[in-house]
Amino acid sequence: MTQDTKTDFQKPSDNDLRERLTPIQYQVTQHEGTERAFTGEYWDHDEDGIYVDVVSGEPLFSSLDKYDAGCGWPSFTQPIPDVALTENTDYKIGYARTEVRSASADSHLGHVFPDGPRDRGGLRYCINSAALRFVPLSELDAQGYGQYRALFEGRQG
């Protein structure tokens, strides 16, 4: 995926999304659903690479910023630099939370909370695995995400 491809993204029709996504992916990304804690594919995933929006493929988070928050969902301290996420105030459970959505596809991703590691900015992006697709470091170039290899340069792996 190139930057041009990302900016030219046109969201598929609802019928196309229903066909392409699993039921939980559709529920989470299109209807602000939440997968059950400790059930998603990536909550304890530990491989180097990036996480992209399951709908659009737009890059969202790096494994370098992923940490175990003990909450049962993938947690990150920040998005990939220069990635645009949309934030909205969500009152669905009776109090204000900050919802996080992808910019191009407007996919519901999860929420951001101010209880992350202080030494890494203090934020916890609590993201549903169902909203993500993982691209391993070894496949970044082949899948069109080669520009993100630089995030990992100089890292002993």
From Swiss-Prot:
GO terms for molecular function: peptide-methionine (R)-S-oxide reductase activity. Its EC number is 1.8.4.12. The keyword Oxidoreductase applies. Keywords: Oxidoreductase. It catalyses: L-methionyl-[protein] + [thioredoxin]-disulfide + H2O = L-methionyl-(R)-S-oxide-[protein] + [thioredoxin]-dithiol. PROSITE patterns: MSRB. Residues 14-137 form the MsrB domain. It is an enzyme of class 1 (oxidoreductase). Pfam families: SelR. InterPro entries: Met_Sox_Rdtase_MsrB, Met_Sox_Rdtase_MsrB_dom, Mss4-like_sf. GO terms for biological process: protein repair; response to oxidative stress. GO terms for cellular component: cytoplasm. Belongs to the MsrB Met sulfoxide reductase family. HAMAP family: MsrB. This is Peptide methionine sulfoxide reductase MsrB. It comes from Deinococcus radiodurans (strain ATCC 13939 / DSM 20539 / JCM 16871 / CCUG 27074 / LMG 4051 / NBRC 15346 / NCIMB 9279 / VKM B-1422 / R1). The gene is msrB.
